[in-house]
C-alpha cells in the first residue's frame, strides 16, 4: 500500500517525513517522498524529485517551475494511485497536494510549527485530518485537527552530577547560519577567562567558516568541536547542558524532548514569524530564553549566557520546565491514526 509524503528539502520538513516513513514501513506501508532537489543527499527513502525553484529566486522561474512540477506530480500521483498524500508544508509540497486534490485522493496534513504554514492553510479545507506538533497552533482549529506532536525520536537523559565542564551545543540550522558563526562564537569568546576554562563548545558551522571559527576558539583556549553537520544529534543533546539554537520546530522538539535548557535565536525572516512563536511557546513554559536577532543581539546574548553559566540552579529549573511544555514525539500516535484509517 503506497502513501506519498509531500515535503520540503530543509531539515525542519524532511526529517519528520523521514521519521514517519520509517515508522509506516514497519506497518507494511510503502512511502515515497515527493520533494525538491535538496532532498536526495539526506535520505535513503524512495523519493521523487520535483524541479522546483525557491520563491526567493526569480519569481517568473518560480511560478513556471511550480506549474511544471504540478503537471509532473499529477502524472506520477495518478500512476501510483496512493491511499493518501500526507503533506508536511513548504512550497515544495504544493504540487503533490494539488495533484491529490484534483484526483480526489485523501489529504492529511502535518504542521510542525505553532503557526499553520501557508501551503497547509491553502489545503486546510481539502484535508481529512490535520496533525499538529504543538498543543496550540494558530489557524489549526476544528474537529479534524489533532495534537500528535512532531516526529522525532529523542529520549531524555540525565547529566553526570560530578561533571565540572559545561557543554554548550550550538545548532545553527540551515537559515541565517552566518549569524551563528560570527555573533554567537564572538560572544562565547568574550566570556571571562575563568568561565571559558569551564566550558566545551560543540557547534554546527557553515562549511566555509569552520576553520575560521575553530581558529577563533583556539586563540581563546576554548575546547571545541565544529562541523557542518552532526548526524548523531541525540548523543550531542545528551551531552549538552545548554543549547543555543534557531527556533525551527524540529530543533525545538528535539531539544525539549531531550530535556535541555535552551537559548533560542529565532530566524527573523521566517514566514509569519513562526520561529519566534515556536520559541515563545517554550519560553512561556520557562524552559528557554529568547534572544532576538537585531542590533542588540550580541549585547543581549552576552548577558543571558553570562547569567545562565553563572547560575546552575536557573539552568536546572529551565531543564525541569521542559516537561511542562507538553511537547511529545507524535510518531507512534500518528501511525496508529493512519493504520486505523486505512485498515
UniProtKB/Swiss-Prot annotation:
Gene3D superfamilies: Glycogen Phosphorylase B (3.40.50.2000). One of its GO terms (biological process) is lipid glycosylation. Keywords: Cell cycle, Cell division, Cell membrane, Cell shape, Cell wall biogenesis/degradation, Glycosyltransferase, Membrane, Peptidoglycan synthesis, Transferase. GO terms for cellular component: plasma membrane. It catalyses: di-trans,octa-cis-undecaprenyl diphospho-N-acetyl-alpha-D-muramoyl-L-alanyl-D-glutamyl-meso-2,6-diaminopimeloyl-D-alanyl-D-alanine + UDP-N-acetyl-alpha-D-glucosamine = di-trans,octa-cis-undecaprenyl diphospho-[N-acetyl-alpha-D-glucosaminyl-(1->4)]-N-acetyl-alpha-D-muramoyl-L-alanyl-D-glutamyl-meso-2,6-diaminopimeloyl-D-alanyl-D-alanine + UDP + H(+). The keyword Cell inner membrane does not apply. It is found in: Cell membrane. The keyword Cell division applies. It is a peripheral membrane protein. It comes from the Bacteria. GO terms for molecular function: UDP-N-acetyl-D-glucosamine:N-acetylmuramoyl-L-alanyl-D-glutamyl-meso-2,6-diaminopimelyl-D-alanyl-D-alanine-diphosphoundecaprenol 4-beta-N-acetylglucosaminlytransferase activity; undecaprenyldiphospho-muramoylpentapeptide beta-N-acetylglucosaminyltransferase activity. Belongs to the glycosyltransferase 28 family. MurG subfamily. Cell wall formation. Catalyzes the transfer of a GlcNAc subunit on undecaprenyl-pyrophosphoryl-MurNAc-pentapeptide (lipid intermediate I) to form undecaprenyl-pyrophosphoryl-MurNAc-(pentapeptide)GlcNAc (lipid intermediate II). NCBIfam families: murG. This is UDP-N-acetylglucosamine--N-acetylmuramyl-(pentapeptide) pyrophosphoryl-undecaprenol N-acetylglucosamine transferase.
Amino acid at each position: 500500500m503506497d502513501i506519498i509524503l509531500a515535503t520540503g528539502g530543509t531539515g525542519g520538513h524532511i526529517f519528520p517525513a523521514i521519521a514517519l516513513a520509517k515508522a509506516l514501513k514497519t506497518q507494511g506501508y510503502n512511502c515515497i517522498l515527493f520533494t525538491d532537489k535538496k532532498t536526495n543527499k539526506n535520505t535513503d527513502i524512495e523519493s521523487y524529485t520535483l524541479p522546483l525553484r525557491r520563491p526567493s529566486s526569480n519569481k517568473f522561474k518560480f511560478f513556471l517551475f511550480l506549474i511544471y512540477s504540478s503537471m509532473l506530480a499529477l502524472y506520477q500521483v495518478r500512476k501510483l494511485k496512493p491511499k493518501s498524500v500526507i503533506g508536511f508544508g513548504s512550497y515544495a509540497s504544493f504540487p503533490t497536494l494539488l495533484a491529490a486534490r484534483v484526483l480526489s485522493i485523501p489529504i492529511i496534513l502535518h504542521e510542525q510549527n505553532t503557526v499553520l504554514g501557508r501551503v497547509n492553510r491553502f489545503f486546510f479545507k481539502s484535508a481529512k485530518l490535520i496533525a499538529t506538533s504543538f498543543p496550540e497552533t494558530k489557524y489549526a482549529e476544528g474537529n479534524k485537527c489533532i495534537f500528535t506532536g512532531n516526529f522525532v525520536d529523542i529520549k531524555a537523559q540525565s547529566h553526570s552530577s560530578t561533571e565540572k565542564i559545561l557543554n554548550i551545543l550550538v545548532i545553527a540550522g540551515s537559515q541565517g547560519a552566518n549569524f551563528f558563526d560570527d555573533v554567537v562564537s564572538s560572544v562565547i569568546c568574550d566570556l571571562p577567562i575563568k568561565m571559558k576554562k569551564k566550558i566545551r563548545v560543540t557547534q554546527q558551522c557553515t562549511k566555509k567558516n569552520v576553520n575560521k571559527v575553530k581558529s577563533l576558539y583556539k586563540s581563546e583556549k576554548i575546547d571545541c568541536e565544529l562541523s557542518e553537520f552532526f548526524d548523531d544529534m541525540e548523543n550531542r543533546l545528551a551531552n549538552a547542558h545548554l543549547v543555543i539554537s534557531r527556533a525551527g520546530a524540529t530543533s525545538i522538539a528535539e531539544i525539549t524532548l531531550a530535556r535541555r535548557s535552551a537559548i533560542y535565536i529565532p530566524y527573523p525572516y521566517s514566514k509569519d514569524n513562526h520561529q519566534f512563536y515556536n520559541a515563545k511557546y517554550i519560553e512561556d513554559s520557562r524552559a528557554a530564553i529568547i534572544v532576538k536577532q537585531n542590533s542588540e543581539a550580541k549585547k543581549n546574548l552576552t548577558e543571558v549566557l553570562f547569567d545562565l553559566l553563572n547560575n546552575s540552579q536557573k539552568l536546572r529549573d529551565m531543564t525541569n520546565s521542559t516537561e511542562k511544555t507538553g511537547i511529545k514525539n507524535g510518531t507512534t500516535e500518528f501511525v496508529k491514526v493512519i493504520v486505523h484509517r486505512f485498515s
